[in-house]
Amino acid sequence: MAHKKGASSSRNGRDSAAQRLGVKRFGGQLVSAGEIIIRQRGTKFHPGDLVGRGGDDTLFALAAGSVQFGTKRGRKTVSIVPQQ
């Protein structure tokens, strides 16, 4: 294996694709059951009422309604307020 770079070669050019994390549905927005609300790594947001958490910490709606952000015991939470 050469330890000097040859002509027209480069040591750069490696990068990973973005993970597309973040809030997908914002406060007050209507969602249907199963819709992804937040994609995250770790529990930056915790699930509240009618919100489930996937194996990769994704938060999703368990029922149709509007998204509501709040805090509970110092943690940021996401809940669903059911439609009347």
Swiss-Prot record:
Record carries keyword rRNA processing: no
Coiled-coil region: none
Entries under Pfam families matching the protein: Ribosomal_L27 (PF01016)
GO biological process: translation
InterPro entries: Ribosomal_bL27, Ribosomal_bL27_CS
GO molecular function, one term: structural constituent of ribosome
Keyword vocabulary terms for this entry: Ribonucleoprotein, Ribosomal protein
HAMAP family xref list: Ribosomal_bL27
Family listed: Belongs to the bacterial ribosomal protein bL27 family.
Protein name per its UniProtKB record: Large ribosomal subunit protein bL27
Organism: Salinispora tropica (strain ATCC BAA-916 / DSM 44818 / JCM 13857 / NBRC 105044 / CNB-440)
